[in-house]
Amino acid sequence: RMRLLTCTGAPSPRRVTLYLAEKGIELDTVEIDLKSGEHLSDEFQAKSPECTVPVLELDDGTSLWNSIAIRQYLESLHPEPALLGREALERARVTQYVLWIEHNGMMSAAEAFRNAAKGMADHALPGRRPVPQIDALAERGVRRFGHFLEDLDGFLDEQGYVAGDAFTVADIDALVMIDFGCRVTKAELEAHANLSKWYERVRNRPAIRAEG
């Protein structure tokens, strides 16, 4: 059986668990204890070269260790409801926004968090190699995340959802990054009218609201 190695509440795993909830897919799950460093073990690195969660283990032992890749694989098995787009252009637009969120939202919030959190000393980047924290990068991450919110608010001035007129994984990723990034950087969502309206609408979707 397929199983998902995850850590409840962490941003990247949440991108997959909310996707599963929206699709109505149930998988066996295994909790990985990040605080104890379980993800840095030889055994886990054999499954995930970057020592990151989530990881989807397939029936034959193959591992997928990237949130985007995991969702693409599951979408091929469970095409409805379509969350990665239907037609070629729609799929391309969803991918475009998912990558934009990854580069501008996830990376900026991670930059702010990993370079400032005490528990991340010598782990400013994923993986087992020691990487020192840099205060200036934490400060830059805070600024970059603010720019991310401004730009996303602008996108939502023209369309109902992040990638267009339909709810997709781009909305899931934006929600996850906002929850994580606003907590890390102390940014205030209320300063962005379009974003605030979109957030309330998405946050109140039944599958997402059920998360608790």
Which functions belong to the PLM regions below?
Residues 1-132:
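GST-like domain detector, emphasizing the conserved glutathione-binding G-site
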Residues 2, 202-205:
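Intrinsic structural disorder
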Residues 69, 73, 93-96, 147, ...:
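Non-catalytic alpha-helical scaffold/packing segments enriched in small hydrophobic residues
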Residues 101-203:
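GST-like fold's C-terminal all-alpha helical module
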Residues 210-212:
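Short, flexible loop/turn segments with low-complexity composition
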